[in-house]
Regions:
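Conserved functional acidic sites
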Residues: 1-216
Length: 216
């Protein structure tokens, strides 16, 4: 039988997933990058109605620097299972994370709700991404967890002007990939976006890597 959205994005109040978060940020006015490591917990808090009037779930994110510390509230997200897709709203941007049918090489425009072409947008790099599945229903090891049925969503992998040489005036790199596990949800995410401009010899951008630690 073919998989449902619920199989790979189960939403129940009280469900949580904890991750190691490796956060890549620019430092020293953009001349370099550094990585900060945290733990984060995503907790399904309540069933709500989203801004389109559909049943959805509110998800709280908590963060701490290391396992001995108390969790601190950090962010709030909205997740909607439409029956044929799984939408996730983060910082007011609505992503179509999963879409039926779940099968290798099936492709969809996962960022189609995001306004990325207006004149002053800083989101141009999100324009026209083709998400597609691979390694459907395959086992995977994520962190220390062995997972028996996972799907990989490749969202983007492109670059311009890389590797950077002394002649490079502009460069850009985008990487985005997620793995979902059956009956758990997202277990891995790797995202990186940066731009380099020779005119001020600096980088802008950021990256995040989420790696599953634990879940209920």
């Amino acid at each position: 039988p073919s998989a449902t959205i619920e199989d790979f994005a189960p939403m129940q109040i009280g469900k949580y997933i904890t991750y190691r978060l490796d956060s890549t940020v620019t430092t020293n006015f953009g001349v370099a990058f550094e990585v900060h490591t945290y733990e984060v917990k995503f907790l399904v808090d309540a069933q709500i109605t989203d801004n389109l009037g559909r049943p959805a779930y509110r998800i709280f994110r908590y963060i701490r620097n290391n396992p001995g510390q108390a969790w601190l509230p950090d962010n709030t997200f909205t997740a909607t299972n439409t029956g044929t897709s799984f939408e996730f709203v983060e910082n007011n941007l609505r992503y179509i994370k999963l879409k039926l049918p779940i099968k290798d090489n099936y492709s969809w425009k996962g960022n189609s709700y995001i306004e990325s072409t207006s004149i002053n947008t800083e989101l141009m790099y999100l324009y026209d991404w083709d998400y597609f599945y691979e390694n459907v229903y395959q086992p995977a090891t994520v962190g220390s967890m062995v997972l028996d049925s996972t799907i990989t969503i490749n969202q983007r992998e492109d670059s311009v002007g890389v590797p950077i040489t002394p002649e490079t005036q502009y460069a850009e790199k985008n990487i985005s990939k997620e793995i979902y596990a059956k009956n758990i949800g997202m277990v891995y995410r790797n995202f990186l976006h940066w731009e380099f401009q020779r005119v001020n010899n600096s980088y802008t951008g950021y990256g995040v890597t989420y790696t599953l630690i634990d879940h209920n």
